[in-house]
């Protein structure tokens, strides 16, 4: 296959054509030795290789990104979900196991070489994978750990390798053909350290532990003109998902235990795929948006607060006094430092059985003011001083 035939056979875009090399060019330039190429073909007898394309990643760069095998799988799966949602409006991906080989498959448009372009690819704002380089990092991370990765679409095969001939090692896509015709994209991961059962928690609607626990699923826009996407709250503790994809235990990623679990669409992770300290306030604001839209979620939320002792009617002063002292080591308690969801005060009152007396509740500053308010026929409510001023919609007591 000459160069013109090579470019046409793989529909190599003009932006990548200058970087791509035919098999003959790669051997002539010493990018691959004849023995390395022969070994590559022996290890993949189902494929016929015709050339290569550099990825522009070194092993050192991939190592600095601190990916894990699980994060790599997450990147593959979220790309599959994005593709199918873009095509059909509904996210879908399949995994299957053949011995030690794991397959991740979708019925999207089928991956093209443009996905391997240096600098990443353009993503829609609603997509799960919005940085554009996740697929390349996922594949090179696994290959750096001697886990072979091949991507298939149409009758094309994109096999990721680390060339031993290049100085310090360079990652390449080896371009090949297969006798099969593939619809969508299939990713083959040989010697996979994870099996398909391990992957179930990675996707919120795959996780059997969350089945039947949904309390709220609220669809809303990030900003005018953006698509409406769902954020959810679950009656299950301590899990965080972003755009259906698993981030981790809330106690680990947000450094606070959570009484409930959350799947937040319009919250963004850092480019490192982690939750950074500076973005934690945005996490609470996004949870607040879901709570503001869902009465059942507010009711459960307040019930959890009361069960944890954060909200109660206390008689420690010898009078009934509402006390709200959130535990800041919990997500649900710390939320009130940043926001008070719409309708939450009403939920407090309903949970405490004071709906008929809500107009008598007064916010007080200290114990003395609580006693005085009670003597005037009011129900005093004490709030922790660090809480958001949005709670000041509760009328203050005036003597």
Give the label of every model feature segment.
Residues 26, 47, 95, 104-106, ...:
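Compositionally biased, low-complexity repeat tracts
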Residues 71, 98, 124-126:
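Alpha-helical hydrophobic/aromatic positions enriched in membrane-embedded helices and signal peptides
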Residues 49-56, 97, 113-116:
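Short amphipathic alpha-helical segments, especially helix-boundary/capping motifs
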Residues 103-161:
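Flexible ATP-lid and adjacent glycine-rich G1/G2 motifs of the Bergerat
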Residues 2, 6-89, 145-150, 154-399:
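N-terminal assembly/transducer modules of large multi-domain enzymes
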Residues 100-102, 185:
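Short beta-strand element(s) in the Bergerat
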Residues 51, 60-61, 92, 104, ...:
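Short, flexible coil/linker segments at or flanking structured domains
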Residues 91-99:
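Short beta-strand/loop element within the Bergerat-fold HATPase_c
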């Amino acid at each position: 296959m000459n160069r013109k035939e090579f470019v046409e056979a793989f529909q190599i875009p003009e932006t990548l054509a200058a970087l791509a090399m035919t098999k003959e060019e790669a051997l002539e330039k010493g990018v691959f030795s004849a023995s390395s190429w022969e070994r590559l073909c022996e290890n993949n007898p189902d494929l016929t290789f015709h050339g290569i394309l550099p990825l522009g990643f070194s092993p050192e760069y991939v190592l600095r990104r601190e990916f894990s095998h699980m994060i790599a799988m997450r990147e593959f799966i979220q790309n599959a979900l994005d593709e199918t949602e873009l095509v059909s409006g509904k996210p879908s991906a399949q995994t299957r196991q053949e011995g030690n080989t794991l397959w991740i498959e979708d019925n999207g448009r089928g991956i093209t070489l443009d996905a391997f372009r240096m600098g990443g690819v353009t993503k829609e704002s609603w997509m799960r994978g919005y940085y554009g380089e996740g697929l390349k990092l996922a594949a090179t991370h696994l290959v750096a750990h001697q886990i072979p990765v091949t991507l298939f679409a149409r009758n094309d095969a994109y096999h990721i390798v680390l060339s031993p001939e290049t100085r310090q090692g360079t990652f390449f896509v080896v371009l090949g053909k297969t006798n099969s015709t593939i619809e969508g994209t299939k990713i083959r991961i040989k010697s996979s350290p994870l099996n398909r059962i391990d992957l179930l928690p990675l996707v919120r609607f795959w996780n059997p532990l969350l089945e039947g626990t949904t309390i709220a699923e609220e669809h809303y826009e990030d900003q005018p003109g953006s698509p409406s996407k769902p954020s959810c709250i679950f009656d299950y503790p301590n899990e965080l998902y972003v755009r259906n994809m698993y981030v981790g235990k809330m106690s680990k990623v947000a450094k606070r235990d959570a009484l409930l679990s959350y799947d937040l669409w319009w919250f963004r992770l850092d480019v490192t795929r982690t939750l950074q300290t500076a973005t934690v306030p945005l996490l609470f604001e996004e949870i607040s948006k879901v709570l503001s839209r869902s009465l059942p979620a507010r009711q459960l939320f307040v019930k959890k607060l009361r069960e944890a002792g954060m909200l109660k009617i206390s008689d420690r002063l010898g009078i009934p006094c509402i006390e709200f002292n959130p535990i800041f080591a919990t997500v649900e308690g710390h939320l009130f430092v940043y926001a008070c969801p719409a309708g939450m005060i009403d939920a407090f009152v309903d949970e405490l059985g004071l709906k008929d007396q809500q107009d008598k509740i007064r916010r007080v500053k200290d114990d003395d003011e609580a006693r005085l308010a009670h003597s005037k026929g009011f129900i005093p409510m004490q709030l922790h001083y660090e809480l958001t001023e949005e709670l000041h919609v509760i009328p203050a007591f005036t003597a």
